[in-house]
Amino acid sequence: MSMSPDEMAEALQHAFQQESQRVNEAAKRAVKKTAKETRKVVQEHFTFNNRSGKYARALTVSTEYEDSFDIRQIVNFKKNKQYLLTHLLEYGHAMKRGGRTLPFKAKAYPHMIYGQEYAEEKLPENIRKEIEKSK
């Protein structure tokens, strides 16, 4: 069977498009999976007294942007304006009686940083696994 150069180019282009689509879909699945796992990691590192549970319930995974080649998911606080507490809890803050040194500073409860580190470490690994699974 012989092919003209145009037919060969068209066949190669079609094959590359299919492979590109397969890899993109696998990467999107990996991003979604990693975002859900990251949310759990952040919640596991809540070491403060979350009396009402509003802070924990407000932590969500949301899709910031998605098209055929790209997806951006973020783990953040969407409900009840709980995002206002994140910086204060993560880094501590000055108390009413003044000062930024102990005992006049509220204790820091880092929790978001663990999620960031987890996502940075796991995302490439999850992408590789999803691509291998989709073959």
Language-model regions: role of each:
Residues 87:
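Aromatic/pi-system hotspot detector in well-structured domains
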Residues 1-79, 91-135:
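Short, Lys/Arg-rich flexible segments
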